[in-house]
Amino acid sequence: MKRFGTAAVIVVLALAGAASAKAQDVSQADRDRALQYLESTKKGVLDATKSLSDAQWNFKPAPERWSVAEVMEHLAAAEDMLRGMTQEQVMKSPAVPMRDAEEIKKSDEGVLAMVPDRSHKIQAPEPLKPTNRFGSPAAAQKHFVESRATTEDYLKGATGLRAHVADSPMGKLDAYEFVLLIAAHSERHTKQMLEVKADPNFPKS
């Protein structure tokens, strides 16, 4: 009898844990919002890099500034890295109690406002600096599109995204907010590509 009692307790605890994670899942509205943001920022990247010549891809406004090709490579590599961090580090951290709704709202909005803001300059970490790892701008662009599709598929199926939290330069973010960060990061660098294209010396063709 004692053995069956212990088993019952384990089952109850497991179900309670599952219910807790479910309670901390994102709403369908928030999930749709993030998917729409991932799609719109992907479109922004593709629009900014559409029909560029080799000269346009590789133009650098100054020796220390990145070309559109280098930004594209950075975006493709960062998509992989940020999603991997979300899946392998954030989501594998211990579940935490549900945060206050107002705190979540403020944190979500902070990601959407701060990450795309180009007035705050951030040095790219060494693993994400351009090295021509994809071989060509077109290959980097293709990799970005494929990686973004993987990110979207992950968001569609993942559960408990609000239950797992990790530190970031903006404070503690949950896994859902790390997905928002992925999209916001591509918005930030789309602005960077448009800055390069707006340079008066940018090749006409």
Where are the language model's segments positioned?
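Bacterial N-terminal signal peptides
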Residues: 7-17
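Short, helix-capping/interhelical loops that line the mouth of catalytic, cofactor-
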Residues: 19-33, 81-144, 164, 199-205
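Short, contiguous alpha-helical
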Residues: 59-109, 149, 153-205
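Hydrophobic alpha-helical core bundles mediating ligand binding, dimerization, or RNAP-core interactions
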Residues: 42-45, 144, 148-151
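N-terminal targeting signals for Sec/Tat export/insertion, comprising classic cleavable signal peptides
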Residues: 31-59, 187
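Second-shell loop/turn segments in exported
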Residues: 28-35, 56-73, 130-141, 175-179
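Positively charged n-region of N-terminal signal peptides that target proteins for export
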Residues: 1-4
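Short alpha-helical hairpin
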Residues: 48-55, 118-125, 157-165
